[in-house]
Amino acid sequence: MSAEGYQYRALYDYKKEREEDIDLHLGDILTVNKGSLVALGFSDGQEARPEDIGWLNGYNETTGERGDFPGTYVEYIGRKRISPPTPKPRPPRPLPVAPGSSKTEADTEQPVLTLPDLAEQFAPPDVAPPLLIKLLEAIEKKGLECSTLYRTQSSSNPAELRQLLDCDPPSVDLDVFDEHVLADAFKRYLADLPNPVIPVAVYNEMMSLAQEVPSSEDYIQLLKKLIRSPNIPHQYWLTLQYLLKHFFKLSQASSKNLLNARALSEIFSHVLFRFPAASSDNTEHLIKAVELLISAEWSERQPAPALPPKPPKPTSIANNSMNNNMSLQDAEWYWGDISREEVNEKLRDTADGTFLVRDASTKMHGDYTLTLRKGGNNKLIKIFHRDGKYGFSDPLTFNSVVELINHYRNESLAQYNPKLDVKLLYPVSKYQQDQVVKEDNIEAVGKKLHEYNTQFQEKSREYDRLYEEYTRTSQEIQMKRTAIEAFNDTIKIFEEQCHPQERYSKDYIEKFKREGNEKEIQRIMHNHDKLKSRISEIIDSRRRLEEDLKKQAAEYREIDKRMNSIKPDLIQLRKTRDQYLMWLTQKGVRQKKLNEWLGNENTEDQYSLVDDDEDLPHHDEKTWNVGSSNRNKAENLLRGKRDGTFLVRESSKQGCYACSVVVDGEVKHCVINKTATGYGFAEPYNLYSSLKELVLHYQHTSLVQHNDSLNVTLAYPVYAQQRR
């Protein structure tokens, strides 16, 4: 048995973002069952415009995966007869039975039963039927963020659903059912009502209103008035209101469940109206009516803001956040030069409006990045700096980053971008981070440092091995895809040769038969068989290569999955290790001892092994502090010096200093922050009471922990060599 479907070709690579998605690679062929599009309310002809459909569910013939993929990433090829999938099929949404029509085959086996009329199921002050309330509460509890809710049919048969609906509401335990069974039971409930929630009696008047009233707001008010007519029991209006509240809650989570007002109206309009067969125009009017009702519910019920995470200690907004004269380094929400991965970790599972600021990854002087939580995702906003002014876009009007942030703590960012209708509510404070180190003596902390460093090194080696395998597999897959394309071209050429040869061979065989030339007939047959055999060999080779490619693609996805699972552990282990290392450094532990715990064998730096560092030139600030010098002068002073030669100067960034150091024969520059907690290169390392203390620490500690390109210590003060 086969069904009708559509074929699409991937135009771009797509890496899946959700569990139900599938990966796409350029050129992949995908098949979508026609029934799945019909179930979502799409009509014939729309399949040719996948970008208008949005997300499609189908089968990737290249990789053998089934799941969702974006319509904007594919192009339509044509129709195809397909076999329905055998493992856990995803059937199209069943259509409701129109009044007066015969039941489906599945339903003929069941007794024709309906629920009591809504007017008989409850009465005010109740707001809806008890069973309906219990069903929707369970669905909202379990499946509010489920991306397949109301789109995927459960495995329960009609008899089981009917049995669930016939239960006594107070006694039934809905926790034993998953969200898809509950969703099917809800749909079955609406379908089994003797009359639809929006009565048939208002259908004709409603269609007239749709054509006569152009204003959406006026139409909604008249539609509500129509449904609340004295001729219709009040329970119908109360039930509709309760359903709209449910749809409103679902649409609030549409970034995760994909159920916006339009999608919900397409799914439920037919069962809310349950009208006789109508034209497509009328159907669209009814879908639009439900969409407007849900949207009106949205506008009438603005959601309360999410509660912020409770901070360890209260912070006074008046004293802290709203002080425009505060230095940027002292702002609790400014984290300096931290990575995007660390930002994502700090903002994970936080409320909308949570934010922090870091240095821009472009490293342009004075540019920063605001990361803001909105709609469950992180939004990155560039803060530009030009001519002493700051802002998100031209014209730049704020005198400082602090003033900019304070402004948007009171005003919505919708002023800047209409899609960012949120304020900067909850700063991620660098002063309120959890204390990682729990041990209370140096030896115990050192042992823990050794354990975490060992785990970090093992994870790093595993990640590096997987990355090499990932790169190699990616290259091999690309080569095999190229080879398959070459096979396809070759087969096409041979087949083009085969067709005319068959025609000519047939003519010549007839001719030689008449002449009795058996030898020529045998030669023609032999050549024809040889060509056919060659085509078969090429097709077999292509098939084997396609099987290899399919296996390797599965391996490739598995490697990628393992890499993604390791990466968060790697980041967390590094952060924990660095916290222990920082704690020991603050306690004055010597680098030699730290190297033992870290397992560092390279301890040949002439300063790192000196037991008594009193003779170090670093103690004399005049050997490295050059005062108000600029970048060009610093580079001239350090040009030609050996790696590790350094100086410290005042930075063009107000209130900060800059360290210039020779690395791999080049002069590099990095900012030294001056904050309320001390000097340092980045949070949470701004803890040195003076520049001298910072220089002495990094005399034996590499700067690589702050910047991968700075694998060097502050070994040689620029003027120390001249004084020897």
Swiss-Prot record:
Residue ranges of every copy of the Rho-GAP domain listed in the record: 113-301
PTM notes: Polyubiquitinated in T-cells by CBLB; which does not promote proteasomal degradation but impairs association with CD28 and CD3Z upon T-cell activation.
GO biological process, one term: response to amino acid
Species the sequence originates in: Rattus norvegicus (Rat)
Protein name as it appears in the record: Phosphatidylinositol 3-kinase regulatory subunit alpha
Modified sites of kind Phosphoserine: S154, S279, S608
Record PTM N-acetylserine, positions in chain: S2
Start-end of Pro residues biased regions: 84-97
SUPFAM superfamilies: GTPase activation domain, GAP, SH2 domain, SH3-domain
GO molecular-function term, one example from the UniProt record: 1-phosphatidylinositol-3-kinase activity
Membrane-crossing residue ranges in chain numbering: none
PANTHER family in the cross-refs: PHOSPHATIDYLINOSITOL 3-KINASE REGULATORY SUBUNIT (PTHR10155), PHOSPHATIDYLINOSITOL 3-KINASE REGULATORY SUBUNIT BETA (PTHR10155:SF1)
Cited function: Binds to activated (phosphorylated) protein-Tyr kinases, through its SH2 domain, and acts as an adapter, mediating the association of the p110 catalytic unit to the plasma membrane. Necessary for the insulin-stimulated increase in glucose uptake and glycogen synthesis in insulin-sensitive tissues. Plays an important role in signaling in response to FGFR1, FGFR2, FGFR3, FGFR4, KITLG/SCF, KIT, PDGFRA and PDGFRB. Likewise, plays a role in ITGB2 signaling.
Residue(s) at site: Arginine finger: R151
Chain residue ranges for the region called Disordered: 80-109
Family, similarity comment: Belongs to the PI3K p85 subunit family.
PROSITE patterns: RHOGAP, SH2, SH3
Entries under Gene3D superfamilies matching the protein: 1.10.287.1490, Rho GTPase activation protein (1.10.555.10), SH2 domain (3.30.505.10), SH3 Domains (2.30.30.40)
Tissues in which the UniProt entry reports expression: The P85-alpha isoform is widely expressed. Expression of the P55-alpha isoform is highest in brain and skeletal muscle. The P50-alpha isoform is abundant in liver with lower levels in brain and muscle.
SH2 domain segment(s): 333-428, 624-718
Gene behind this protein: Pik3r1
Domains as described in the record: The SH3 domain mediates the binding to CBLB.
GO cellular component, one term: perinuclear region of cytoplasm
Keyword tags: Acetylation, GTPase activation, Phosphoprotein, Protein transport, Repeat, SH2 domain, SH3 domain, Stress response, Transport, Ubl conjugation
Alphabetized Pfam families for the sequence: PI3K_P85_iSH2, RhoGAP, SH2
Modified residues (Phosphotyrosine): Y467, Y580
Assembly, per entry: Heterodimer of a regulatory subunit PIK3R1 and a p110 catalytic subunit (PIK3CA, PIK3CB or PIK3CD). Interacts (via SH2 domains) with CCDC88A/GIV (tyrosine-phosphorylated form); the interaction enables recruitment of PIK3R1 to the EGFR receptor, enhancing PI3K activity and cell migration. Interacts with phosphorylated LAT, LAX1, TRAT1 and LIME1 upon TCR and/or activation. Interacts with phosphorylated TOM1L1. Interacts with CBLB. The SH2 domains interact with the YTHM motif of phosphorylated INSR in vitro. Also interacts with tyrosine-phosphorylated IGF1R in vitro.
Domain SH3, first and last residues per copy: 3-79
